[in-house]
């Protein structure tokens, strides 16, 4: 209700825990709860390398907002399962933190990204991907990702791939603004 009163009429929640996103969307759609239109994912799909949490992500299973996938067959299985349980979007964490390396690296290969996209698209569900690196933007756009989140460090090749393949970008400037404003304070705590 607060979001509606603030003028927000629609939003996307890319990944949720415990089926909260689809349950809230369904409650809003049924009129049981006042709120904006919601398009939601279930858990984000991560490889065992992890997302932004690196070694904090387990090698398998579900943790919070993340479902760990390690093979192409698991990717297809979990995309289908997420759609079965109400996902409007499938979210991939295409990049992740790798100990000893700076920045985030592409942690999915082309075949894995393509398998996720093909499976979701066959069931009329779009795919978004967390991409914090030039290579991830390019590869995800080329393999069928519909919405590139962040697009950090995107280069000309990545931009061309986005345009050529009809992908969209959600740059999430809030993250970068907060990093610029508060990054030095966070680094003192960590």
Annotate each PLM feature.
Residues 1-34, 66-88, 118:
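Alpha-helical scaffold segments that flank or form the walls of functional sites
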Residues 4-5, 12-15, 39-41, 128-129, ...:
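Active-site neighborhood of phospho(di)ester-bond hydrolases with catalytic His/Asp-centered motifs
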Residues 4-9, 32-67:
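Metal-cofactor-binding active-site regions of metalloenzymes
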Residues 8-10, 32-37, 87-88, 121-125, ...:
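Short, well-ordered coil/turn segments that N-cap beta-strands
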Residues 14-21, 44-45, 173-175:
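Short, solvent-exposed turn/loop segments enriched in Gly/Ser/Thr/Pro and often Arg
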Residues 15-18, 42, 94, 152:
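Residues that line or immediately flank small-molecule/substrate-binding pockets and catalytic motifs
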Residues 48, 93-190:
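Active-site core of metal-dependent hydrolases
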Residues 55-114:
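Active-site gating/metal-coordination segments in enzymes
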